[in-house]
From Swiss-Prot:
Name of the protein in its database record: E3 ubiquitin-protein ligase complex slx8-rfp subunit slx8
InterPro entries tied to this protein: SLX8, Znf_RING, Znf_RING/FYVE/PHD, Znf_RING_CS
Catalytic activity: S-ubiquitinyl-[E2 ubiquitin-conjugating enzyme]-L-cysteine + [acceptor protein]-L-lysine = [E2 ubiquitin-conjugating enzyme]-L-cysteine + N(6)-ubiquitinyl-[acceptor protein]-L-lysine
Signal sequence, start to end: none
Regions of compositional bias (Polar residues) in chain numbering: 60-70
Region (Disordered) residue spans: 1-75, 166-196
EC number, UniProt record: 2.3.2.27
GO cellular component: a single term: SUMO-targeted ubiquitin ligase complex
Annotated function: Mediates ubiquitination and subsequent desumoylation/degradation of sumoylated proteins and proteins containing SUMO-like domains. Acts as a critical suppressor of gross chromosomal rearrangements (GCRs) during normal cell cycle progression. Involved in stabilizing, restarting or resolving transiently stalled replication forks. Prevents accumulation of DNA damage during cell cycle progression.
Basic and acidic residues bias: start-end ranges: 1-10
Renumbered zinc finger spans (RING-type): 206-247
Quaternary assembly: Part of an E3 ubiquitin complex including rfp1, rfp2 and slx8. Interacts with rfp1 and rfp2.
SMART domains, per database record: RING
Length: 269
């Protein structure tokens, strides 16, 4: 076995060709790098975007093992948290200003609507003050529309002849409604026509066949039909047993044959 001084010489000779620095050389290189960074201007940290000062960063003078790394250019965690809070506070006023702009626009729109409603009211008052007659006429027309027949009981019997009532016509024209029948006959004798009863019955038309009724029959609601037409229209079910004119419920047993009644009255006379 060779002496100890020869073994050390062989180790130094093996490490020399590969230029492997010793631990003291690595520590010296690390200290030199730290000194160069301290003397150079402060760089921005990659994490939070804020500059790191020399006081906020603790640089070790060296390392004790090869696995330890140098925490270069890193700020303490507390400083990074404060910086992130400041960044959030800087963004809040921008969002709040946007909300304020939206609220102001909504309030502006509401003011426009109120102004438009006020303008409509003013126009209506101006129209009524300058043209009250036209406004009252329009209201009268609306009332007349609502006064038209709206229920079955208000329906007009179109199968019957409307009797001429001169007094009603005079009243509508604004004359004295207390005019007697004698005065009306003197004023308009041509409009007074006497029609025989036979001719009146012949003028009736069945609304189903649109012809002169055969076996003239009448429903309880006062409408005239042919006896065959009305019985065929009523049928045998409750759904169809309705008057073809006013749609009231009519049972076939309630249909009155007028010709039979007229014949019996003639025999009695």
């Amino acid at each position: 076995m060779p002496p100890a001084h020869k073994r050390d010489t062989n180790v130094r000779n093996l490490s020399a060709p590969y230029n492997i620095p010793s631990q003291s050389a690595r520590v010296a290189a690390g200290n030199a790098a730290i000194n160069r960074r301290r003397s150079s201007p402060v760089e921005n940290s990659p994490g939070n975007g804020f500059p790191v000062s020399e006081d906020a960063t603790d640089y070790p003078s060296g390392t004790t093992s090869e696995n330890e790394s140098l925490p270069l250019n890193r700020a303490p965690r507390s400083l990074r948290e404060v910086a992130s809070e400041l960044a959030q506070e800087e963004t809040l006023p921008v969002e709040t200003s946007d909300l304020n702009i939206d609220v102001e626009s909504e309030v502006f729109d509401l003011e426009d609507i109120n102004f438009q409603n006020d303008a409509d009211d003013i126009n209506q008052r101006f129209t009524y003050n300058n043209h009250p007659a036209s406004v009252e006429n329009s209201l009268t027309n609306v009332n007349s529309i609502h006064a038209q027949p709206t229920t079955i009981s208000d329906m007009i019997d179109l199968t019957d002849e409307t009797s001429y009532d001169p007094r009603k016509q005079k009243f509508e024209q604004g004359k004295n409604p207390s005019t007697t029948n004698a005065e009306i006959e003197k004023e308009e004798p041509s409009k007074k026509q006497v029609v025989p009863s036979s001719q009146r019955l012949a003028d009736y038309k069945c609304v189903i066949c649109l012809d002169s009724p055969e076996n003239l029959s009448c429903t309880p609601c006062g409408h005239i039909f042919c006896n065959f037409c009305i019985l065929s229209a009523l049928g045998t079910t409750a759904a169809t047993q309705k008057c073809p004119v006013c749609r009231r419920k009519v049972h076939p047993n309630k249909v009155i044959c007028l010709e039979m009644m007229l014949g019996s009255q003639k025999k009695k006379s």
